């Protein structure tokens, strides 16, 4: 079990999801929000602001995920808790992006602000959640079939320790424990 590699997979997936979400959102802005004033010039869709966003925003998302602890304890995660953390971080991050980056954009009506916020949140959250769910499911499967395990020591001896060992190892699905020994107590 290589924790650094597994953490890198999450970081890479989060980076890709942030890039994909920003790209799709940028296209949405250029084709559905701004054409009323600026028109649509396909050659100028991916301009300097887009490139700057592709550099800064994914790194910002990675920092936010790091600060909220989404890269800690990657093997012992509940997918539900991870989903809740992703929702909370996405709401905070999208709100930050909205107020500090998007609020000065041209909109034809104030209802467009609601659309912009909702579309950015939906794109970012859904793409990130799908990537994370896939990684977490693969990880849980590896834990359940015993490919990934956690070194475990049973404290006790004789029949009682053997009984505990047999109860844990006889389960159809592995709990992730890889027993490395017993500590004998008198």
How would you name each of these model-derived features?
Residues 154-186:
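Acidic, Ser/Thr-rich low-complexity segments on the non-lumenal side of membrane proteins
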Residues 1-148, 177:
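Signature of alpha-helical transmembrane segments in polytopic membrane proteins
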